């Protein structure tokens, strides 16, 4: 702050007779142009020999600029500034005052200094301690907090302070000057001939931020991205990749979406692959979006691998201010660049872990990751700087980033956990997901393991403990409830909040689904768990399956788009558990919930298959399981068909959950209407109607809108007496059955108990592929039979050695999910 001027100043030091710090008086006219004096309490340390060798250390206090009578006032400001420098001394809490007097001993040496705060090159430096009766103007304990930047020494000329900008970089990363980043370089020109009109770009960008942003990847800072898009200053390859993602959700009849998608996708992938040797965040983000489009395909693995290797080569933990979609003449603020660099790295990390379900391979090693987790979205949008934790839970050091730019914004909170949002907790959960997949699939890929997965000494024990700690330490602001979901939806983060809890529930369901699902025979090398562990697994899997469907239904009712590809596996895993409870009818309560929630999972899978055609294998696999078990349903009793919701406009006009209906033909979930409505829904806060928020708030607080079906009786729908047909609502699950006329009149038919099916599954079919992906306990080489795994009788010793899952059932607050 005091070293900005290039003029040479003369400094004169003086003190009062009562000076308790220097303990001696200096000559008032001593010129110290070439001398350097170090202030100390011991006068013996102030020897002339040491004074000439040691640097000067200006005492902390209040500095006031004053002029002598013969000073040229044209070089001085109208109002003398005052510089506050914190002061601390063990004998007093009073702040001394230093007066800097400008003298006209010399003139400015160059005209380039005419804009300096003070142009006169000489200043007198006088010191006077405060009176003993005057109290300090600020507490001693708050000195460091109020004055975080304290000059410890002055080497060279002195100058008054200048106003500090909030986010101004003193230096630009040399990567901005790369040849391909020049104003007319290929980064800004290649692919521009394939861009649609600006109006279409803006529409697709708006759709992208509704459907894809934060589910789970966060690639852009929305305000700066939209501003650059409107001014047409974005790299064309980035815009093409964004348009290829957004057009999947664009509902229009004016254009051929398939043709536009192929054109934009092929051009963006060609540009990105041709420039894979140019390490830049633009190409990393392009590969991430291209892999997002190719979910559950071989290209997904290829594009994700390119993005992972490029972002690792950029060293995001060492270079925080990498260039992105900004230019050297208008760079993004330092805080935004730091967070975007972190977010792109963690996006690649989540790509790697989520893809491990399909390819069984993970490239990033946890021991090599030292990048701090992203901060909260609200802090990110307001360009704040915050300290967060690392993936291992240790607080990150702010020195590496604050030292890179000393003018960075002040740290918001010293508590790292307060600065972490849902994206940081989602990254931790995805990390656990990747290790769970690797751990459990090793049981079917390796011939020997020291302990089975349910054993207290197994490798899964540590992962189970991490799951428990994650749920236990989750902040209240991130715990699920319908009202919290609505609150985040009003901030544009509803889909991201739902994805956070879907990943958590999916991990539990992936592990414990073996105990409550119709699936294949377990691998012979995996020892069957004890009865106690199996029962706890069945309860936990059933709870998570119902909770997943309730989250999906809450998003539907609150008009929250939930289009993340990984949610297809969540809905499929939940559907298999619900189908098992519906067919076996081991519990009337579970069967009733399954009848309500099973069509929700089916509808979500059908909707995702429209957005991502490759994910249609999950919907077909669930239909195939129901088809193989369809013979178990009593022919005289029609199977259950459910309606997802029913519109009630008598009071508030909000949607209420409907009940179950029936059809007289076909098996459950085997009939699916090709005209399934998958219309895009706008964000609730974008509607101008004043009653929108209040209506959604009432709906969010209404957690008991779903009624269980009544038992069959005379005149019920189970007897075949259908009500008068009504026009189905937009949210009705249309699969051959009419909309019930009265809530609560549908019933669940009586079905036989489940018997092991001898139906073989073609490994090349959709069901065979899904079983290999989702059933970790299935041997890849064994025959696939649809049956309930037969458990062995466990001994008391085995039950004492198994993992206790009851803590999960206790900690999992099912009431928050509306169950």
From Swiss-Prot:
Residues 36-63 bind DNA. InterPro entries: TF_fung, Transcription_factor_dom_fun. It comes from the Eukaryota. The modification Phosphoserine is found at residue 16. Residues 28-83, 96-134 are annotated as: Disordered. It holds the Pfam family Fungal_trans. Its main location: nucleus. GO terms for cellular component: nucleus. GO terms for biological process: DNA-templated transcription; regulation of transcription by RNA polymerase II. Keywords: DNA-binding, Metal-binding, Nucleus, Phosphoprotein, Transcription, Transcription regulation, Zinc. GO terms for molecular function: DNA-binding transcription factor activity, RNA polymerase II-specific; RNA polymerase II cis-regulatory region sequence-specific DNA binding; zinc ion binding. Transmembrane segments: none annotated. Residues 64-77, 96-118 have a biased composition (Polar residues). This is Uncharacterized transcriptional regulatory protein C530.11c. It comes from Schizosaccharomyces pombe (strain 972 / ATCC 24843).
